[in-house]
């Protein structure tokens, strides 16, 4: 008998060796990166689109990108299938008999052990039993007809894959080699497969494969680095029947059976093993469900269990309807409300049934999730918990106590709201990631790295905090539930959670499918009485509901708006808020005192309404701030004067949205100036450079804090850095103006350099003063010596440091050298900070001197005239202006530039 790859079949099992079986690969090529991707087994290639790209790859999580190499996706798919060693014995029962102890067909060597098979890139995971053909020839071949790679590429040597990818059976297997001629033949294999009613046929050594593929339970592969940590367990019965848990993959030498034979051999040990594995993967969830039903736990635990049920839905399979979820919740509610009021429960059930009869009012997917073309910065708010639109709405209630959001007397509305949100999220997107994240509700106030949005407006008066209406950044509501009107999503309408001092009017605050998570496009309309209302471009607000939603209705800090509201109805412990919904009231508990954030004194004078026009554009959103009620005009005038004098932090100064837009505009001007300079238009580029420098100064002033002692280190660092960089840009502009003999403009630019450096030194002064004192204490003056009265402290410090350093060099005593070691090493940071401070002061004074020289040169060189005199006078006014009020200085600089350029 001829040898096959160095393996000589023995007489005991030569007749029982099965013929090798070919499992065919299916590949698809990306039309963008032209990389081939191995398709899962059973994929119907006729269902693939004509234009296929890597982003459509959905069977390997996190690998649907063109930058992933071809080998990575192939190896990742192969890694999902593992080989299980079958039993050593093979029973003889005929040509089409599959022994129960054999899980996958294989080839055996002379000693009865399993021969080492070559690992294939398309190894199939299948737990069904395959028959061993007793009448097959005993010869065991490893020719290329055992495998047909669809891309006509050579396969790596078998010994490499044997040692690398089958470590479990290495000690039982014998490495086999493959000749170059045999590998060459594998290039000419066909990619097509033939299936006829489940019976696989072999035509001209073109082996086919079964088109039904067993799915992969992701619980089997938690150790794979490409598998997400949050593995989805699939409850769907159809999914369970269609997909099965398997622990072994079919080898190259396996002979595929027909689908009918697989169904008839359903009772083999491998199927039993798979069933046990499948049951084990669902054990935790079933036990958790049983424990919840038996122990009658609190309602929020029910929500956690239901959230787990939502996460286990197959997002790419059949979708559940709202009614099915409501039926499930109603069945579980029987345990939750055990011993409760049955009459109230019946009323709640009737309300839900009525809500089902009004599908036209059910919130649409856009009410909870922003469209793909817009930034998903909008948030839903519920009792100090933010949930971004990217998160599953069921997490809104995950970490909350059972009575923190809704009382147990009204559980069904909360259930339905969560179910409605989850169902909409499932139906509105074809693929939802299982990884979720919670957004911290406490945003850093005035953070310079905020997105293009407005920072939250807060009131430091805690006694009147419930009377002030606040709006949060990006058009959302602020995090503190005690001072907001928090809209909550329900299937048929929205119920606003009102703070103390406000009363719900009508059945709901907003109705219809208005996108609540974002402001949308808001129009300003001044109705009679100067009441500003918001047109949400959906079902509009009713006149009696406008004040409840108006974010600027209470600009007066004395609670002007809340005087017209009905007194708050207090619940138990005086901390519950009641919402009017027709004749029904929902009791809300909030724990306001514990969750209320502390507010700095610098925010006490923040105004809500302003006479200034500020525009915010983000996506399709646009908010216009207009004047508010005349009753608050006196207070607004005082607040605005405080802002101009720099006495208090204003919304404009702390507005992250304005800072971001100003910074973007300044950078755009600088880039445009660079392009003009590259084209040789130096005069035009200089004007744009200087205008960009002025805008950078404005951005740095917005990051300032009026009270340096209470300022945050992050804001101070941002402001100092911006001032230092802007000073260099202004210096560049000044030198450019001097080259063009525009001395008046150069004087203005030098003035900006002076202001920028003085501002930077101003914020460095506290640390510089401490550094000076620290260094002063280190370098003590020797007894009997007294410094000159005309010398400064820094001069004394330098002179003593140098003299002692020289004496240290001259002496040979190590003790003397050790005494001055702290000055050289330990205080290096103090020295560097002090030098940076002195450098800023020196550069500022140098810019002052140059600005005076430039204005003098401009006055002597230009012809006298009224326009010239006015321009020079305005420039002198700018030069005499102090550096504290940057905004006023920028206004004067622009005015002077207009006068000198006319």
UniProtKB/Swiss-Prot annotation:
State one molecular function term (GO): zinc ion binding
Q: Which Gene3D superfamilies match?
A: 3.30.40.100
Q: Which parts of the sequence are CW-type zinc fingers?
A: 21-74
Question: Cellular location of this protein?
Answer: Nucleus
Instruction: List the disulfide bonds in this chain.
Output: none
Which Pfam families does the entry link to? THD_CWZF3-5-7, zf-CW
Q: In which tissues is it expressed?
A: Expressed in leaf sheaths, flag leaves, nodes, internodes and panicles.
Record region (Disordered): 131-233, 326-345, 420-480, 537-651
Comp. bias regions, Basic and acidic residues? 151-169, 193-203, 214-233, 335-345, 612-625
| Cited InterPro entries | CWZF3/5/7, THD_CWZF3/5/7, Znf_CW
Bias (Low complexity) ranges = 421-433
Keywords, A to Z?
Metal-binding, Nucleus, Transcription, Transcription regulation, Zinc, Zinc-finger
A Gene Ontology cellular-component term: nucleus
Task: Enumerate the residues binding Zn(2+).
Answer: 30, 33, 54, 66
Q: What does this protein do?
A: Binds to histones H3K4me1, H3K4me2 and H3K4me3 in GST pull-down assay. May facilitate the recruitment of effectors to mediate gene expression.
Q: Which PANTHER family match?
A: CW-TYPE ZINC FINGER (PTHR46524:SF7)
Under what name is this protein listed?
Cysteine-tryptophan domain-containing zinc finger protein 3
């Amino acid at each position: 008998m001829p040898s096959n790859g160095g393996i000589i079949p023995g007489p005991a099992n030569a007749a029982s060796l099965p013929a090798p079986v070919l499992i065919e690969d299916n590949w698809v090529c990306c039309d963008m990166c032209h990389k081939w991707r191995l398709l899962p087994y059973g994929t119907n290639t006729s269902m693939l689109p004509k234009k296929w790209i890597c982003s459509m790859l959905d069977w390997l999580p996190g690998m649907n990108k063109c930058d992933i190499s071809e080998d990575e996706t192939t190896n990742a798919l192969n890694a999902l299938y593992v080989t299980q060693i079958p039993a050593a014995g093979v029973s003889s029962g005929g040509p089409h008999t599959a022994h129960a102890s054999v899980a996958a067909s294989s080839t055996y060597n002379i000693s009865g052990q399993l021969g080492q098979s070559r690992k294939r890139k398309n190894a199939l995971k299948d737990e069904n039993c395959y028959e061993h053909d007793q009448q097959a020839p005993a010869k065991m071949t490893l020719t290329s007809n055992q495998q047909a790679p669809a891309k006509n590429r050579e396969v790596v040597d078998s010994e490499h894959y044997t040692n690398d990818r089958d470590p479990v059976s290495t000690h039982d297997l014998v490495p086999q080699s493959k000749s170059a001629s045999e590998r060459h033949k594998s290039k000419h294999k066909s990619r097509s497969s033939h299936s006829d009613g489940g019976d696989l046929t072999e035509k001209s050594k073109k082996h086919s494969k079964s088109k039904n593929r067993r799915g992969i339970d992701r619980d089997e592969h938690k150790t794979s680095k490409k598998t997400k940590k949050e593995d989805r367990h699939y409850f769907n019965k159809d999914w369970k029947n269609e997909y099965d848990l398997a622990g072994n993959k079919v080898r190259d030498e396996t002979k595929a059976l027909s689908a009918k034979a697989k169904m008839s051999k359903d009772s083999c040990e491998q199927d039993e093993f798979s069933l046990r594995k499948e049951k084990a993967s669902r054990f935790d969830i079933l036990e958790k469900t049983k424990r919840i039903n038996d122990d009658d736990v609190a309602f929020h635990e029910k929500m956690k269990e239901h959230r787990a049920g939502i996460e286990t839905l197959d997002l790419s399979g059949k979708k559940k309807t709202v009614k099915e979820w409501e039926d499930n919740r109603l069945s579980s509610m029987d345990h939750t409300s055990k011993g409760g009021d049955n009459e109230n429960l019946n009323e709640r059930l009737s309300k839900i049934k009525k809500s089902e009869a009004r599908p036209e009012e059910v919130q649409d997917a856009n009410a909870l999730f922003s469209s793909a073309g817009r930034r998903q910065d909008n948030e839903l708010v519920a009792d100090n918990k933010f949930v971004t639109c990217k998160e599953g709405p069921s997490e809104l209630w995950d970490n909350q106590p059972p009575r923190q959001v809704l009382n147990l007397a009204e559980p069904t509305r909360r259930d339905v709201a969560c179910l409605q949100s989850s169902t909409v999220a499932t139906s509105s997107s074809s693929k939802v990631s299982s990884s979720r994240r919670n957004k911290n509700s406490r945003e850093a106030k005035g953070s310079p790295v905020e997105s293009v949005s407005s920072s939250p407006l807060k009131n430091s008066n805690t006694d009147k905090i419930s009377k002030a209406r606040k709006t949060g950044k990006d058009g959302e509501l602020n995090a503190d539930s005690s001072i907001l009107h928090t809209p909550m999503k329900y299937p048929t309408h929205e119920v606003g959670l009102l703070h103390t001092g406000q009363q719900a009017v009508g059945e709901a605050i907003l109705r219809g499918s208005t996108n609540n998570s974002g402001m949308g496009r808001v129009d300003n309309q001044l109705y009679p009485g100067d009441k500003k209302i918001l047109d949400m471009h959906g079902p509009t607000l009713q006149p009696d509901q406008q004040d409840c939603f108006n974010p600027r209705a209470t600009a007066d800090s004395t609670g002007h708006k809340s005087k017209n509201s009905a007194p708050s109805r207090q619940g138990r412990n005086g901390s519950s808020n009641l919402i009017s919904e027709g004749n029904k009231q929902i009791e809300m508990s909030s724990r306001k005192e514990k969750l209320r954030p502390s507010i700095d004194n610098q925010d006490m004078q923040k105004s809500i309404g302003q006479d200034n026009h500020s525009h915010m554009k983000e996506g399709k959103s646009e908010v216009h701030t207009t004047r508010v009620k005349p009753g608050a005009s006196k207070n607004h005038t005082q607040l605005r004067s405080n802002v101009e004098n720099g006495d208090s932090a204003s919304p404009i100064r702390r507005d992250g949205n304005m800072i971001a837009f100003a910074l973007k505009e300044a950078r755009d001007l600088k880039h445009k100036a660079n392009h003009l300079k590259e084209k040789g238009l130096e005069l035009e580029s200089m004007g744009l450079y200087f205008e960009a420098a002025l805008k950078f100064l404005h951005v740095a002033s917005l990051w300032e804090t009026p009270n340096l002692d209470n300022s945050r280190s992050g804001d101070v660092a941002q402001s100092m850095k911006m001032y230092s960089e802007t000073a260099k840009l202004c210096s560049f502009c000044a030198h450019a103006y001097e080259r063009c003999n525009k001395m008046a403009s150069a004087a203005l630019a030098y003035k900006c350099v002076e202001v920028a450096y003085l501002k930077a030194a101003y914020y460095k002064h506290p640390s510089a003063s401490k550094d000076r004192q620290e260094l002063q204490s280190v370098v003590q003056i020797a007894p009997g010596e007294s410094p000159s009265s005309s010398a400064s402290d820094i001069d004394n410090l330098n002179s003593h440091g140098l003299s002692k350093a020289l004496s240290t060099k001259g002496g040979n005593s190590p003790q003397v050298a050790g005494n001055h070691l702290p000055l050289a090493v330990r205080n290096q940071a103090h020295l560097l900070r002090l030098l940076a401070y002195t450098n800023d002061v020196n550069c500022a004074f140098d810019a002052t001197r140059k600005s005076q020289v430039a204005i003098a040169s401009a006055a002597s060189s230009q012809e006298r005239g009224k326009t010239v005199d006015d321009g020079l006078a305005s420039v002198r006014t700018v030069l005499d202006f102090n550096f504290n009020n940057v905004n006023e200085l920028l206004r004067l600089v622009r005015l002077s530039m207009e006068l000198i350029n006319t």
